Amino acid sequence: EDRKYTWDEVYKRAVKFASALSKIGIKKGDTVSFLAFNTPEIFEGHYSVPMIGAVLNTINIRLDATTIAYILKHSEAKALVVDRQLHVEVKKALKSLDKKITIIDINDKHADQSKVEKIGDLEYESFLNTGDDNFNREMPNDEWQAISLSYTSGTTGNPKGVVYHHRGAYLMSTGSSVAWNMPSRLNFLTVVPMFHCNGWCYP
């Protein structure tokens, strides 16, 4: 069964997820990592994480355990939202971390359940539902405040972190809307992986 959300529903779900993150202690400046396919959850993450002033870090699903662990350590991730289909490499990566981080599992109902394993103690939908509908999102007090942290592929060594700021994200989205002459009710097919430069900045 396909999942369909209106923009209003996406906004409300993002608010609730932001609230749920806040309740477990995620705050302004903290990094929240996502390791997931192009699913509604990672899309919502692009909105929910910045709502609490936290920094979104999307990780390439094709990386090995060593590289995943390096990114989680280097980014100082406080939480990891991860698709259970990626359990093999993720479990290896988590074993090498110096400290525990909060793990929130995405359980994709479309996945082959024989190849899915539980990773953390929290499940995305259940966790989201602990959030408050009336949560007051935090606006950035500085346009240069970090909104996301991406990593290079690391072809000549360890991956390098690249910080994007709220100003850049705003100007990119506004400029694209004008340049593409986007209508108010746009249907958009995202074919670029959302872990890759945040879907080339069009999530």
List the model feature ranges, each with a label.
Residues 43, 47-52, 74, 196:
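Short hydrophobic alpha-helices that are characteristic scaffold elements of the AMP-binding
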Residues 170-189, 195-203:
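Conserved AMP-binding/adenylation subdomain of ANL enzymes
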